[in-house]
Amino acid sequence: MDKSTQIPPDSFAARLKQAMAMRNLKQETLAEAAGVSQNTIHKLTSGKAQSTRKLIEIAAALGVSPVWLQTGEGAPAARSAVSVADGSPLVLEPLHPWDSDTPLDEDEVELPLYKEVEMSAGAGRTAVREIEGRKLRFSYATLRASGVDPSAAICAQLTGNSMEPLIMDGSTIGVDTATTHITDGEIYALEHDGMLRVKFVYRLPGGGIRLRSFNREEYPDEEYSPEDMRSRQISMIGWVFWWSTVRHRRGPSLVR
């Protein structure tokens, strides 16, 4: 093979081919599952294209972390994915309509919902609080697949574009409050002086942390020492094991 056509082992194309091999997926099968053309998958696997707007969909079909697929950081497998290799794409668990009067299924649990709220006498200050009367239903199977104890699981609503396009503004996230020990490159929810923040977290020497956004063009890395964390009231809420996004139209589509 000519050197000019060789694919670097640390490239997007190499990781995509590795993930397809692990799942025993062909290009046409992956393309159909992710909602893209086979030509798009061909360009990505050949190295002719280095990124795609369909990153999340492709990663979901492969059952891999979109962060690992795009950057090579972290573990390849999505923490909540079921390990299969039968040549079929992964599918998301279906959503079922319900209201407060709908009884729980045997395999369901209700999780409390938290969000950032403005304090009544805080002059614009906020705090992360549970929203009374608001619950989200999860299956025990989903929590078991992620290794999450249902009694430690909560949901929270994210605001801001710092993690886009991985986690969109307005997304609901699932948080394991029992997992606060930092694994470098994993995504965690934190409370920062009353703000709910979701970031990649890395350990620093001396007990500090580095916070990294997926949208690094607008949000540079932040580093905090243990003293900074105390003075700025930064505390770990838990590991983000799941998220779900409903897109909101902000204006005319740029794609025609």
Curated annotation (Swiss-Prot):
It holds the Pfam family Peptidase_S24. SMART domains: HTH_XRE (SM00530). Keywords: Antibiotic biosynthesis, Bacteriocin biosynthesis, DNA-binding, Repressor, Transcription, Transcription regulation. One of its GO terms (biological process) is negative regulation of secondary metabolite biosynthetic process. GO terms for molecular function: DNA binding. PANTHER family: HTH-TYPE TRANSCRIPTIONAL REGULATOR PRTR, PTHR40661. This is HTH-type transcriptional regulator PrtR. The lineage of its organism: Bacteria, Pseudomonadati, Pseudomonadota, Gammaproteobacteria, Pseudomonadales.
